[in-house]
Amino acid sequence: MRAHRTQLCGAALGHLGDLLLGDPRRGHPVAAFGRAAAAAERVLWRDHRGAGALHTALCVAGAVTAVTALSRTARTLAGAGGATLVDAAVTWTVLGGTGLRQEALAVARALHADDVEGARRLLPNLCGRDPQALDADGVARAVVESVAENTSDAVVGALVWGAAAGAPGMAAFRAVNTLDAMVGHRSPRHLRFGWAAARLDDAAGWPGARLTAVLAALAGPSPRGALRAWRADAGSHPSPNAGPVEAAFAGALGVRLGGTLSYGGRTEHRPVLNSRGRAVRREDIAAAVRLSRRVGALALLVTSAAGALRAGRRAERGAR
C-alpha cells in the first residue's frame, strides 16, 4: 500500500504540474528520447520487420530501464519522498493535455479572428494534415479530431499505464507512442520497419482509448449520442483506437467527424463518424477542449481508484 500511495501522490502532482505548467519548455525528455530513437534507427534500419522489432524493443527497454533506475536511486537516497518526486516528474513529462489544449485554442483564436492562413500555419502543431487544402471549417474539424485522439494518447492512456505499472509503465507507453509517430506509418521507408511500433502502439493504446470513449460519453453534453456514434461508427475507422475516441467525441458534441482528408500529399476518404451530427464549426474547438479537460480529470480519478483497489487486494492476499 505504501508504494501505491507514493505512485498515487506522484500521479496527482504530475497531473497538477501539467495543468499549471504545461510541457517542459526546454530539454523535454520525450524530445531527447526521439533523438536517441532516430540515432538508433540510422544504425539499425533495414527494410525488414525484424529490424524494426529490434529497434522498438531496444528503445522501449531503454526508456523503462532509465526510469526504473532513476526511481530506485531516488528511493535509496531520499526514501518514499524521492520516489514520489520521480513519479511526479515522469507523469508531468509524459502527460500532454495542457499543451494539446493550448495548441487547439490558438487555432481557434485565429479562426475567430478570420485569420484562416494563420490557423493553417498553426495546425501542424497538432496533426500531420496538409493544411493548405482546408477551409476554416476543415481546419476546425481537424483540430477537434486531434483533440479527441490525443486526449487518449497524451492523457488517458498514460494514466492507465501509470496505474498498471507506475512510472516505468508511463515511460513505456510514451516511448511506444513516440515510436509510432516516428516510424509507424506507411511510407516506403517505414512500411516494414515501422510495423512492430505500429502494432505495439495499437495494443498499448487499446485500454486507454476505450476508457477515453466511456469518459467522453459520461462527461459530454450528449451521453446517448456518444454511445450511439461509438457503437455505430467506430469499427469503420481505420484505427482501432482512434475510431472509438473520435466517434464518442463526435456523438457527445453533436458533430460529424471523418470524411476526406490529406496527409503528405496523399488523399484519404475516411468514413463519417456520427452522421446525424452537423458539420464542425470553429466554436466546437472550445467545446472539444472543455470535454478533453473533463475526461482527463475523470481519468485521473478512475485510474487512481483502480490502483487503490488493486493494491488493497494485494495487501489482503499478503495478510492471509
Regions found by a protein language model. Give the residues of each.
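Short amphipathic, positively biased membrane-proximal segments
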Residues: 1-320
